[in-house]
């Protein structure tokens, strides 16, 4: 008997029906370089979700599909999970879990910093998520406090790594040859090409 492997991406539907048939879109939660994120309520279950809306262009379709593929592959408690994807003539809609605690950057700013214990709690989760993605040959390439969301507003400091748009899948021993990410956060050795 052959081993049976369950592949998570087989359970992430990619639909070409209108998102409005299944979700009521609400307020805008944030914007980025390539799109916006809005609150959404699933009509049948009343569960709240976040929807990343990305405009289709010739230049970015493959980039969006790569991000969808990567997010469909990863399943880790500290990586934002997606549930389904919708596509219409002009946009892709990536439906994900909603993180209600805001960006790590804002939480650090509001608190005026973290205690060593709180910093260790966040770093342990961050490293766990990054190690998991690396074990799956996926490199995020844009880790920064703005791409780490707090799952909720409680003091447990549970984080989710988001925005895998710059991520890349690598084969064993393959090296990256391009510089991606947010310039302000890029390590000097990456800028030098080391």
Regions found by a protein language model. Name each.
Residues 89-103, 107:
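Conserved short submotifs of the Hanks-type protein kinase catalytic core
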Residues 26-33, 37:
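Protein kinase glycine-rich loop
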Residues 122-123:
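Activation segment signature within eukaryotic-like protein kinase domains
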Residues 84-85:
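A short, aromatic-enriched beta-strand patch in the conserved N-lobe beta-sheet
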Residues 128-138:
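Protein kinase catalytic-loop region centered on the HRD/HxD motif
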Residues 48, 53-75:
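Conserved N-lobe beta3->alphaC-helix segment of eukaryotic protein kinase catalytic domains
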Residues 177-190:
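Conserved activation segment of eukaryotic-like protein kinases, specifically the C-terminal portion
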């Amino acid at each position: 008997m052959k081993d049976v492997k369950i592949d998570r991406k087989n359970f992430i539907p990619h639909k070409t029906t209108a998102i409005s048939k299944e979700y009521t879109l609400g307020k805008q939660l944030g914007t980025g370089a390539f799109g916006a994120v809005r609150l959404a309520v699933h009509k049948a279950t009343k569960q709240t979700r976040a929807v990343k809306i990305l405009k289709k262009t010739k230049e970015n379709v493959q980039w969006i599909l790569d991000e969808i593929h990567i997010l469909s592959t990863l399943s880790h408690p500290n990586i934002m999970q997606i549930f389904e994807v919708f596509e219409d003539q002009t946009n892709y809609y990536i439906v994900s879990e909603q993180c209600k605690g805001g960006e790590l950057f804002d939480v650090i700013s509001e608190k005026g910093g973290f205690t060593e214990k709180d910093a260790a709690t966040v770093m342990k989760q961050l490293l766990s998520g990054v190690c998991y993605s690396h074990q799956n040959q996926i490199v995020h390439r844009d880790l920064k406090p703005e791409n780490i969301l707090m799952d909720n507003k409680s003091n447990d400091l549970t984080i989710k790594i988001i925005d895998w748009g710059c991520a890349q899948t690598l084969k064993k021993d393959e090296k990256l040859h391009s510089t991606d990410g947010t310039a302000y956060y890029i390590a000097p050795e990456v800028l030098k090409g080391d």
